[in-house]
Swiss-Prot record:
Lineage: Bacteria, Pseudomonadati, Pseudomonadota, Alphaproteobacteria, Hyphomicrobiales
Protein name: UPF0173 metal-dependent hydrolase Meso_1362
Keyword vocabulary terms for this entry: Hydrolase
Disulfide bonds: none
GO molecular function, a single term: hydrolase activity
Pfam family, one: Lactamase_B_3
InterPro entries, per the entry: Metallo-B-lactamas (IPR001279), RibonucZ/Hydroxyglut_hydro (IPR036866), UPF0173 (IPR022877), UPF0173_UPF0282_UlaG_hydrolase (IPR050114)
PANTHER family: UPF0173 METAL-DEPENDENT HYDROLASE MJ1163 (PTHR43546:SF3), UPF0173 METAL-DEPENDENT HYDROLASE MJ1163-RELATED (PTHR43546)
Family affiliation: Belongs to the UPF0173 family.
């Protein structure tokens, strides 16, 4: 499995023949200056955790250019269908549901956040936010938490899915901060490795992963903080 972080919550995962982008906020991302074309090369799937603009990002352009499958909640799926994405390439789901993505499955799990898109000064409701658990038959299970606070039912996510890799928001203000995120990882999960995200993008959120790293000291989980664009082989 290969994972590349592009800053904020944008990731590319290559595993089991799939090339997946999650929350592809690439153009306009202050921590990634090289556009969406490179990260989207050969992509087979685009997965979205919720409907905020800094997570939808370049989804429409990527879908039109690559022919990738969209995996998202019902409302986001309908939104992109109305933008001209063919229904055959849209794979919707919702809380608790698991969808077959061809080569892996995605399960929609809870996240404590909000989800809408602002257009022409108005908010467009785009369903509930989610975390996403990706199961690969012959590789590690990945849990992208989306944007969220800590919550007690993370224990059920561990019980049901046993994710080995965690992609964890730590930037505070709009998600849990680093210390709380570390508590979530240590109390509820047995991750082999975690990559913190949703930090350092805008001045209003935490700029470094130091609080998270400090909170994870002594844990068996490996904390990886690659610079944006650097591939990690897991």
């Amino acid at each position: 499995m290969k994972i590349t972080w592009y800053g904020h919550s944008a990731f590319r995962i290559e595993a089991g023949g799939a090339k997946i982008l999650i929350d592809p906020f690439l153009s306009g991302n202050p921590t990634w200056k090289e556009g969406w074309e490179g990260p989207a090369e050969g992509v087979t799937h685009v997965l979205l955790t919720h409907g905020h603009g800094d997570h939808l990002g370049d989804t429409l352009d990527i879908l039109k250019k690559t022919g990738a499958m969209l995996v998202a909640n019902a409302e986001i799926s309908s939104y992109y269908g109305a933008q001209g994405v063919e229904g055959s390439r849209i794979n919707p789901g919702n809380h608790g549901g698991t969808v077959d993505c061809g080569g892996f499955t995605t399960t929609f799990v809870n996240a404590l956040h909000s989800s809408s898109f602002t257009k022409d000064g108005s908010n467009i409701y785009l369903g509930n936010p989610h975390g996403l658990v990706l199961h690969f038959p012959s590789d590690k299970t990945v849990y992208h938490m989306g944007d969220t606070d800590i919550f007690g039912d993370m224990a059920l996510i561990e019980e049901l899915h046993q994710p080995q890799i965690g992609l964890v928001p730590i930037g505070d203000r709009y998600t849990m901060g680093g210390a709380v995120a570390a508590l979530a990882c240590r109390r509820f999960f047995r991750f082999e490795a975690v990559i913190p995200c949703h930090y350092g993008t805008f001045p209003i959120i935490d700029q470094t992963a130091e609080k998270f790293i400090e909170g994870m000291e002594g844990a068996e989980t490996k904390v990886l903080t690659p610079p944006p664009g650097q591939e990690v082989d897991l």
